Swiss-Prot record:
Vaccination of mice against the protein elicits humoral and cellular immune responses and contributes to a prolonged survival time during acute infection and a decrease in brain cysts during chronic Toxoplasma infection. CDD domains: C2. GO terms for biological process: exocytosis. The keyword Coiled coil applies. SMART domains: C2. Regulates microneme secretion. Probably involved in regulation of rhoptry and dense granule secretion. This is C2 domain-containing protein. It comes from Toxoplasma gondii. Residues 1239-1257, 1405-1414, 1492-1502, 1550-1561, 1620-1629, 1675-1698, 1712-1722, 1729-1747 have a biased composition (Low complexity).
């Protein structure tokens, strides 16, 4: 055989490459299994297009059985014979699986041959099916022998067909059925060999062609086999003929069918059926008996059966009545009526009553509907319900109540007699399952269940097993018959339901369900009584269950087998052709087939490949679920619906719907004139009996135009024929069928809903209008989507709940996450038309948009079951969108949870606390399947209560509790940031709910049972059937194809990435280690488990995935890093996956030459030929130093952000108690310290983790730049007319953070958040300032554009007002805006036309003036409290320098004014002495705005007053002398400085008596100096710096402490900010000379009080006070109350003079000791070596300090206390600043409120004035009219002078007048306040009827008189 193949290839190589003839086709590729190529020989037309072969080659190509035989030597042939048979598998069970001999059923029929040559020949064929016979050429010596090995199994031969021409296919009249035996390995070894022979008379037959193919290809291929046979003649390979046949080749298998989890839903017991029969309507809206049925009058069998049935029923009931021992006078109808009454009473707990009485509520005025205010919403709903009460009550019918809501029948009480013989208290049901239409070996198989109570839902967890023997085709064609019986009913009437369920596809989708049909006895009774058409609207319940198939055959044959059984009815269609295929993307060729769907099942034709003009000529057979022939009724036929034909196109990686059409069964039996069609003779084949049978039937032949789901201009037409086998009209006796009704939206609705559907739609539209849901000024605004009808793929309009139904998920999809994953595996597509696909169509076409995925997912979730809904709304771009919502009850938090499942992105949004009444949700979620009905009943009861319908007080607990204990909150808060702009409606398979709350889904309460929040479209509890039939999900992708796809993906991705990098001159290295591949695949498997895990298993799956990540990263070498990308795809197309990886994975283009790539692929096979593909690609590369630093910096930044976010969450969780108690600075400081501590700890932890992320990396030095955040960051903006500028006050303090945020991103985030929540387009909002120090973000909202949309057309003022309301909730929503604001934000806006920048500038100006006067009450420079100095930070110093430069210009301008003012004051007061106290009092005055830092009584007092103190000439001379002394003797100054540093604090003074007085350290807060004085000051500073450098060599570590050094000889202008005693601070005194200064003696212990610097300052102030005569200054300033009070509060103590003397003496002693110490230190320094200078100085210093132990202890304690006070002061300062800012904001807010209130007050006053003007105008007009009437002539005296005013009533005449206050609820006898009006005087009218009659007569007489006069 191999030699033959080589010969053929050599011959083809010699053929010249010329275009082939039209009649020639290329030979198909040979299949696997060693089959040889088809060869044939025939003379073509002249042999054109081929080169003649050599004669020697032609002689070798003998067409006999030895053609292509293998050649062996004799020894090789012997070895071939002795070779043992092949085995496969390692374990014994696996070897047995492959080599076990099996039975296969083979049927070959419909064999045809078509001649492609011009010559006619008589043909016959031989088939060798299986066998191992093989011919071999054996070289034995010089001869060549032909030997045959193996054996034949099945040999078939057809009859001879004469004169086979090329006119068309010729039937060979051959049909054969037999059994083949062989193992799975035999299918691979053995072949089917077909030989085509030409029959010749009087000579040998001629072999025309030979065909071979492995049996495995036939066992896995299609049933329709079509092959072309070729042969060589005259050197040309031409097509000889084509053979086609049907081959049924499937394994006989023993299937174990397990029936588990079966139940009955909404069944009606026998008594309920009898009650419904008794109460049924008489021919309501139906056809009459004669018009619909038209029975043959000679059908006596049915009449006899009916009479016998009624007799049996009567006899059974009489027997039961006698057993019950009825009371005298009690008859059966009365008992039945009593049962009905009791049943109605039991239904009353749900609010259903057969007769509902409405109280006389009177008529409501429709004017109440015109109000659109929110507070009138409930009133509007009540008015709408009252107006449409007839519609609501008409659609709410008791007779259509789903049986699932019916209450259980009353059970027998204890003590009641059981003589009736019943085994149970209530109705008991049982179910019988049997196989129908099965093969002869399976007939009689069935199961009978045990009895269950009929109340509720009868369930059977395990019914048993049935062992079915047959092929997969036999199992698919089998139906199971389900009969439900009520064992307590009479024997004749026990059957209460009947159904047939096809087992087609049960091996792939094990869930079965069907609607129960009419019982046989009821169908017979309705047929004989003439109301059979009414049964179409009756629902007898549903049966559901699961059939598990334990084991399956390995191989499965594709295609259909057209076979009919004589005991059932079939619908047969012969699909001919389609004139032209129109594809959506204009494909040149396509593989197509036709699928026929009818009666809950579908069949398909064979696939015609590579053509746009397919010709099938194939028959499709569909079994019909009908009872026995004579039991078929008219309703059984009409309720079947339409027959649909769909043309599908398939190819590698795509499925297209190429059009569809439909017809009805009525068209098969009747023509266009409604006459019966003629009978036509047809034939059918019985494969089991291998016979052909003839029958007569009516044939419908037509052509229909296909309807497309895509837009197409070209038409496409399909031709087909249809008939039934046998003819239904003949076997059932039905003479006439009703004409098919036009399919509408309400065709399958229950009667009550169908009759009121249009009115319900009008009511729905009215609710939308009255609620103002489409009003652009309220709520979210348009566009909104409230449609309750959708257009499906067949261009039919359907009610939204009919698009959803309960679908049991396929096996393995058993959780909400797995359902979500399965739906996302359906590819997404963009539709050209607005069509909605049904779930089964979306799975079949394997594509859809968000709406299709949401409907599919909701249907699957309902089948779990779950509380699921389809949500329809809009995205932020205002496009329509759909997603899925599920309701859950959280037992831990005792709250309701809503989950939004976004199918497009794969994200799940969880919203907690979204139910005001979680208790009701808890009760309803316990039964998700039927809890929705109970929830609808709650809403129904509320609606009926509005209508005034009496409801029984015995209400279930879950209904009575609804509405109680509600969470009184306007909107829910918190939750994830949603991508949805509005939520408009929700629907599932039960109803549609309209959202009448706020449109934003984040602000919606999901208590859909509350009529005030959700409007229910359909008031009744109707069970609406779906508009489609659930047919399962189909098979999975074949295993061999699946395995090959995985290998193709991996190879394609490797080659494409390598080629892609090669185009960029980059090398690619792949790590193909087996261990690594297995480990990566394990990670993908864990990822899939986490994506599909149940809620209770999710944490475990996530933990396993985290452990895998840690193990993976732990194997990374040092100084290397790994970057990976896990990707998911819903296809196995290798090109699509490869292109997506290259486009989306950035590190594919990595230029690092040390990079190694790794790849892993994992595929999951899902039902419906869906695939879930996971790909993980990673790269390992060496990390450079620059890259390492960048990575660490990014991780450090991320760690800081995480720490800050964590701290903010902790603050929000703990509350804002510090903000409420702002005056308590100590608590605020502690809180700030804790926050910084948490942030620092988190940052350190994250930093350590980041350092470990890169192996072998060194930790970089952490440099934190203080003061990096500016106070204000700005950018430009354009302010036009109509722009509103405002600010957002945030809680986050950016100014205190280490790094400044990205200003551009910050502004973009703010703009995006405002635009998103206001629904504005980008560019309308402009954020342009970030005032970090003030915690404000300034933005502007521009005016609307001319061509703006409806949402953008809103004015800026309205947007600001709306933003004021929603801004706090925006800050609470998780997202970027929450991070920016810190969880809290308020709007600062002063009203229309204002600019917040003006307000900010005013605040800054006010703050600047207060700073000059009071320094804001907060110290901002180096300050000293209790001897401890607080040094300002570097960032503050830099800011101070900038401020100094900015303020210099302002100060110079003020300087001139101040000088003039000082001169004027001197002239007025007569001298400097009189002016000084006033200046001091002005400085000591409290600030205008009270600061919250009351606990820190800091009062600013400059050493030299800000107004400038003019000293006397004598004093100036003294100062000059002191300066000279400084220059002459530095040794005298140094001890003074040392004493100032080392001096202990003086005698402690109580803090309450001596508050700290802060003195400014420089000219910024003190006196402004002259230019000359500044120069001298700079010289002094340089001089002191030099002295400090010298002292640093001699002094110990005193300068590292926070103690301020005071130089005794310095001027007051340059003295630092220090606290002074209050006794000295109230007045100014001249500085004492240096000789008078006394240093106090050291104390043994450190005590709180004034430091040494304060003591020296006190001495200096004391001497100045003495020289300036303190008594005279105080007496001169006694007139000022403020200064007097200040002086009294700061008065010195009585013992101050003695303390000063002691201090001076101690200072002198200390100065002497310091001089001696300096001398010793200088000597020691000279003796030390230069290399150990520092060491010797420390030793000498230590010896000096150790010379006095008390000094050392005192110094250490003083240093520790100073540091502690410094830290405490910093905290206090920050607290004071924060409190001051809060007070400023509060004052600003109060001012804005006052301005707004004033504006409103002005508006009210204006309205009041306008109303007064209108009142005056009305009074004037009334007076004019009255004068005009007075000027008319008076009437005659006999006229009546009274007119009666009454309330409006309904009268026959027109005497009633309209009163201003109408009361329609009063009766005629209850009228009051009637008055008679006569000559502008009124009095009470008489209420008697006589006075009314008299008044009426007078009025009529007046009218007559007036008529006569005119």
């Amino acid at each position: 055989m191999m030699k033959l193949k080589e010969m053929v290839e050599a011959a083809e190589a010699k053929v010249e490459s010329k275009p082939p003839q039209a009649a020639e086709e290329k030979a198909p590729d040979q299949a696997a299994g060693g089959a040889e190529e088809d060869v044939a020989a025939a003379p073509a037309e002249g042999g054109e297009g081929a080169e003649p072969l050599d004669q020697a080659e032609i002689e070798k190509m003998l067409f006999d059985e030895s053609l292509g035989a293998q050649e062996y030597t004799y020894e090789e042939f012997l070895d071939l014979i002795d070779q043992p048979p092949e085995e496969r598998g390692e374990a014994e069970d696996e070897r047995k699986h492959w080599s076990y001999p099996r039975r296969w059923k083979v049927v070959l029929w419909n064999l045809q041959i078509q001649n492609y040559m011009d010559d006619n020949f008589s043909a016959f064929m031989e088939f060798e099916f299986g066998g191992t016979r093989e011919e071999c050429k054996v070289h034995k010596g010089t001869s060549v022998l032909i030997y045959a090995t193996g054996q034949d199994k099945n040999y078939l031969r057809t009859p001879v067909i004469p004169d086979v021409s090329n006119a068309g296919p010729v039937d060979m009249h051959f049909r054969k059925a037999f059994e083949y035996r062989g193992s799975y390995l035999d299918l691979e070894r053995e072949k089917l060999k077909i030989k085509v022979w030409e029959y010749r008379n009087w000579t040998l037959n001629h072999l025309e062609a030979v065909y071979e193919e492995a049996l495995l290809n036939l066992a896995t291929g299609e049933t329709h086999v079509e092959r072309d046979l070729y042969k060589f003649i005259k050197g040309r390979r031409s097509r000889r003929c084509r053979i086609s046949f049907h081959l049924y080749f499937q394994e006989l298998y023993d299937f174990e069918l397990s029936f588990v989890k079966w139940r009955l839903v909404q069944i009606m017991p026998c008594l309920t059926l009898q009650e419904k029969i008794a109460n049924r309507g008489k021919n309501k809206g139906g056809y009459t008996r004669e018009a619909t049925i038209g029975f043959k009058r000679h059908q006596l069998a049915d009449q006899a059966k009916y009479v016998f049935q009624q007799r049996q029923v009567k006899r059974e009931m009489q027997k039961r009545d006698s057993q019950r021992e009825l009371l005298p006078g009690a008859s059966r109808p009365e008992m039945l009526g009593g049962f009905a009454d009791k049943g109605s009473a039991r239904l009353s707990h749900l609010g259903f009553e057969s007769a509902m009485k409405l109280p006389n509520r009177g008529t409501r005025s429709p004017s109440g509907l015109e109000s659109n205010r929110p507070e009138d919403g409930n009133r509007n709903m009540e008015e709408i319900f009252l107006q449409h009460q007839a519609t609501i009550l008409a659609s709410d019918q008791l007779e259509e109540l789903p049986a699932s809501l019916r209450p259980p029948l009353s059970k027998r009480r204890k003590g009641e007699d059981k003589k009736d013989g019943n085994k149970a208290d209530g109705p008991q049901v049982k179910m019988t399952i049997s196989l129908m239409h099965a093969s002869s070996m399976n007939k009689g198989l069935g199961l009978v269940s045990s009895e269950r109570p009929a109340d509720g839902i009868p369930r059977w967890d395990n019914l048993g097993e049935i062992y079915f023997r047959g092929t997969l085709r036999d199992l698919d064609s089998t139906y199971i018959q389900v009969v439900v019986e009520d064992t307590t009913a009479p024997k004749v009437m026990r059957q209460i339901g009947y159904g047939q369920i096809p087992l087609r596809g049960v091996v792939d989708y094990s869930c079965l369900s069907t609607e129960l049909g009419t019982p046989m006895w009821l169908a017979l009774q309705a047929k004989m009584e003439g109301w059979g058409h009414e049964l179409k609207e009756w629902c007898f319940g549903f049966v559901e269950g699961t059939v598990m198939v334990a084991h399956l055959p390995r191989y499965r044959q594709l295609g259909e087998v057209s076979e009919s059984d004589s005991d059932r009815v079939y619908l047969i269609l012969r699909i001919k052709d389609v004139d032209q295929i129109v594809t959506p993307d204009n494909r040149p060729v396509v593989d197509s087939y036709v699928e026929v769907s009818f009666d809950g099942t579908s069949r398909r034709t064979r696939t015609v490949r590579n053509t746009l003009n397919p010709v099938w000529d194939d028959e499709v057979t569909i079994p019909l679920r009908l009872p026995a022939f004579r039991d078929i009724t008219e309703s059984d036929v009409t309720r079947k619906g339409k027959v649909w034909l769909d043309v599908w196109g398939t190819g590698p990686g795509y499925v297209d719907h190429l059009g569809g059409c439909s017809f009805s069964l009525y068209e098969i039996f009747f023509n266009e004139k409604h006459n019966k069609r003629n009978l036509t003779a047809m034939q059918r084949i019985d494969l089991e009996a291998n016979t052909r049978q003839s029958y007569e039937t009516r044939v419908f032949s037509t052509s229909r135009r296909l309807a497309f789901i895509h837009k197409a201009d070209r038409p496409s037409t399909i031709q087909f024929e249809a008939w039934t086998c046998p003819d239904i009209l003949e076997v059932s006796g039905i003479d006439k069928l009703p004409e098919p009704e036009r399919i509408t939206t309400t065709s399958n609705f229950p009667r009550a809903l169908r009759n009121t559907y249009e009115r319900l739609k009008r009511m729905y539209a009215e609710v939308i209008e009255k609620k103002g849901l489409v009003n652009p000024d309220t709520g979210v605004g348009p566009p909104r989507f409230f449609d309750v009808e959708f257009l499906d793929q067949r261009k039919e309009t359907h009610y939204a709940p009919t698009m959803v139904t309960r679908i049991r998920p396929p096996f393995g999809v058993d959780s909400e996450s797995s359902v979500f994953h399965y739906c996302r595996c359906v590819p997404f597509a963009v539709k050209r038309e607005n069509l909605v696909f049904t779930p089964e169509f979306a799975v079949q076409i394997r594509s859809g948009n968000a709406m299709d995925h949401s409907i599919l997912m909701t249907s699957l979730l309902l089948g779990l079951p779950a509380f699921a809904f389809v949500c329809v709304g809009t995205l932020w771009d205002k496009h329509m969108h759909a997603w899925v919502a599920t309701f859950h009850y959280d037992d831990d938090r005792a709250c309701g949870v809503v989950k939004f499942w976004e199918t497009t992105t794969g994200l799940v949004y969880t919203l907690k606390h979204r139910f005001r009444d979680p208790y009701t949700l808890q009760r309803l979620s316990a039964d998700p399947e039927f809890g929705i009905l109970k929830m609808m009943n709650i809403q129904r009861r509320k609606r009926l209560s509005i209508l005034g319908v009496s409801v029984d007080a015995d209400t279930p607990d879950y209904i009575s509790r609804s509405g109680e204990d509600l969470v009184q909150s306007e909107f829910p808060t918190g939750g994830a940031k949603l991508p949805y702009r509005s939520l408009d409606i929700m629907f599932n398979n039960r109803n549609v709910w309209l959202n009448i709350q706020d449109g934003n889904p984040a602000k919606v309460w999901f208590d859909i049972w509350d009529v005030e929040q959700w409007y229910q479209f359909s008031p009744g509890l109707h069970d609406v059937p779906p508009c489609f039939i659930v047919r399962g999900f189909g098979a999975k992708v074949a295993e061999w194809q699946f395995d090959r796809a995985a290998q193709e993906i991996q190879g394609k991705v490797l080659s494409d990435i390598t080629a892609f990098r090669a185009t960029r001159n980059l090398p690619t290295k792949w790590n193909r280690d087996d261990v690594l591949d297995a480990f990566l695949q394990m990670g993908l498997e864990l990822l899939h488990q986490a994506a599909t895990a149940r809620d209770e298993d999710f944490q475990l799956a996530r933990l396993k995935l985290e452990d895998w990540k840690k193990a993976f990263y732990s194997k990374v070498p040092c100084s290397y890093r790994v970057r990976g990308a896990p990707l998911h795809f819903n296809t196995y197309d290798s090109k699509t996956i490869s292109d997506a990886i290259i486009a989306n994975v950035d590190f594919v283009e990595s230029r690092d030459r040390s990079a190694f790539f790794s790849l892993a692929v994992m595929l999951y096979n899902l039902p419906g030929e869906l695939v879930s593909t996971y790909v993980y690609i990673c790269v390992t590369q060496k990390v450079t130093e620059r890259e390492r630093r960048r990575i660490l910096a990014q991780k450090e930044k991320q760690s800081r952000e995480d720490a800050q976010r964590k701290a903010r969450k902790q603050r929000r969780k703990a509350g804002h108690e510090g903000a409420d108690n702002g005056a308590e600075d100590k608590q605020g400081a502690e809180g700030n310290e804790e926050e910084h501590g948490d942030a620092a700890a988190a940052a350190v932890a994250e930093e350590s983790v980041s350092a470990e992320a890169v192996q072998g990396a060194e930790e970089p030095k952490k440099v934190v730049k203080k003061g990096a955040v500016p106070r204000v960051k700005k950018r430009s903006y354009e302010q036009v007319e109509g722009t509103e500028v405002a600010a957002i006050a945030i809680e986050r303090d950016f100014f205190t953070e280490a790094e400044a945020p990205d200003f551009k991103n910050l502004m973009t985030d703010v703009e995006h958040a405002i635009n998103t929540h206001l629904g504005l387009s980008p560019g309308r909002v402009r954020a342009f300032q970030a005032r970090y120090a003030e915690k404000r973000i300034v933005f502007a909202v521009g005016p609307p554009m001319d061509d703006a949309t409806e949402a953008d057309a809103v004015s800026s003022v309205a947007l600001m007002e709306k933003l004021r309301d929603i801004l706090p909730s925006m800050a609470h929503e998780e997202g970027r805006f929450q991070e920016v604001t810190g969880g809290g934000a308020t709007l600062q806006w002063d009203g229309p036309g204002t600019n917040i920048l003006d307000r900010i500038a005013q605040e800054q100006a006010t703050a600047g003036e207060g700073e000059q006067q009071t320094s804001e009450g907060i110290p901002t420079r180096d300050m000293q409290v209790d001897g401890t100095a607080v040094l300002e930070e570097a960032g503050e110093k830099s800011d101070k320098k900038k401020k100094k430069k900015e303020k210099k210009e302002k100060k110079e301008k003020k300087e001139k004014k101040e000088k003039k003012e000082k001169k004027e004051k001197k002239k007025k007061k007569g001298g400097e002495t009189a002016a000084e106290p006033e200046e001091a009092s002005a400085v000591l005055a409290p600030p205008p705005v009270p600061a919250p830092a009351a606990a820190i009584p800091s009062v600013l007092l400059p050493t030299d007053s800000e107004d400038g103190e003019k000293e006397k000439p004598k004093e100036k001379k003294k100062e000059k002398k002191e300066k000279k002394k400084k220059k002459d003797g530095e040794t005298d100054a140094e001890p003074d400085e040392a004493s100032a540093v080392l001096a202990p604090p003086p005698v402690p003074v109580p803090a309450a008596a001596i508050p700290s007085i802060l003195l400014p350290a420089d000219g910024e807060d003190g006196e402004e100096e002259k230019p000359k004085e500044k120069k001298t000051e700079k010289k002094k500073e340089k001089h002191t710096e030099k002295k400090h450098k010298k002292k640093s060599e001699t002094l110990p570590e005193s300068e590292t402490t926070a103690v301020v050094t005071v130089t005794p000889g310095e001027e007051d202008e340059t003295s630092p900010l220090v606290p002074v005693p209050s006794s000295i601070a109230s007045s100014e005194a001249p500085e004492p000379p240096a000789s008078t200064r006394v240093t106090p003696a050291p104390e043994p212990k450190a005590k709180p009080g004034l430091s040494m610097g304060a003591a020296l300052l006190a001495v200096r102030a004391r001497s100045r006070l003495q020289r300036k005569h303190l008594a005279q200054q105080l007496s001169s300033s006694s007139s000022s109350e403020v200064s007097a009070s200040s002086a009294s509060s700061l008065s010195p103590s009585s013992s101050s003079s003695s303390d000063f003397a002691e201090t001076r003496a101690k200072a002198d002693a200390l100065r002497a000791r310091l001089q001696a110490a300096q001398a010793r230190l200088a000597a020691a320094r000279e003796t030390e070596v230069s290399s150990s200078e520092t060491e010797s100085s420390e030793t000498s210093e230590a010896s000096f300090l150790s010379s006095d132990g008390e000094w050392d202890a005192l110094w250490q304690s003083q240093r520790a206390a100073a540091m502690e006070r410094q830290q405490r002061l910093q905290k206090m300062v920050s607290g004071v600043k924060a409190a001051y800012r809060r007070l400023e904001e509060e004052n600003t807010r109060l001012a804005a409120t006052r301005r707004r209130d004033d504006k409103l007050q002005r508006q009210v006053e204006a309205e009041r004035e306008r109303a007064v003007e209108l009142l005056k105008e009305a009074t004037r007009r009334a007076k004019e009219e009255k004068d005009l009437i007075a000027r008319q002539p008076p009437p005659a005296r006999d006229w009546s002078d009274t007119v009666v005013l009454s309330t409006p009533q309904i009268f026959v005449n027109s005497q009633a007048a309209c009163a201003p206050f109408a009361d329609s609820g009063r009766d005629e006898g209850e009228r009051d306040e009637w008055y008679e009006v006569s000559d502008a005087c009124s009095r009470r009218a008489e209420s008697s009827n006589e006075s009314r009659t008299t008044a009426g007569a007078k009025l009529r007489q007046q009218q007559l008189d007036l008529a006569g006069r005119t």
